[in-house]
Amino acid sequence: MRPAAAGVVLGVALAVGVPTAWAVTRPPAAAGAPVEQVLGTPAAPSAGAPAPALATPGVTVRDAAPTAAPEVVAPVRVAVPARGLDVPVEPVGTRPDGQMAIPDDVDRAGWYRFGPVPGAPGSAVVAGHVDDVEQGLGAMAALRATEPGDEVVVTDGAGTVTTWRVVSRESLPKQALPLDALFRRDGPPRLTLVTCGGPFLPEVGGYRDNVVVVAEPAS
């Protein structure tokens, strides 16, 4: 999947000040093998040069201990019962080259841990490979058959189950993915499921498009 923030092409770094866009690809496979490429996402926050110190305003504030950040419970399974999709999910970040570290196992998917969890404001992104020359068809291949209205069931690490409804399914050229929308961190909760689709391009060793399925809370 490749989000394109501010007109950025999949797999191409974005301008400073916007999250980096990058392609998620499988390791090289045998020539001509139908190995998928998956969506790219904004790069994880990186340590940069410290910001210049700001002048201290002349206002006395109440002394208080910082509020503890809420505990994040990661999703561990996503299912679309009507399409036979039932896939374990693990938290993933980025690889050293800036690509999303999608699980190599095509029967697993990755949740982008630098974005929201399902149910939090913004778009929670879960991506997986559509297939592999050695492993065959992946679990996320079933996304290509989803339809608006399909139920999506998400289970988190605490055993909490939430239900979602598919509102859209699109096959988008990787060079035209709306990265900012796919990876937004604010606004109503949304679940974004991504895999590869479209024709396989032997010259690049991957698929031309990304299948993007968007679901919203069922209640």
Which stretches of residues belong to each language-model region?
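N-terminal export and membrane-targeting signals
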Residues: 1-14
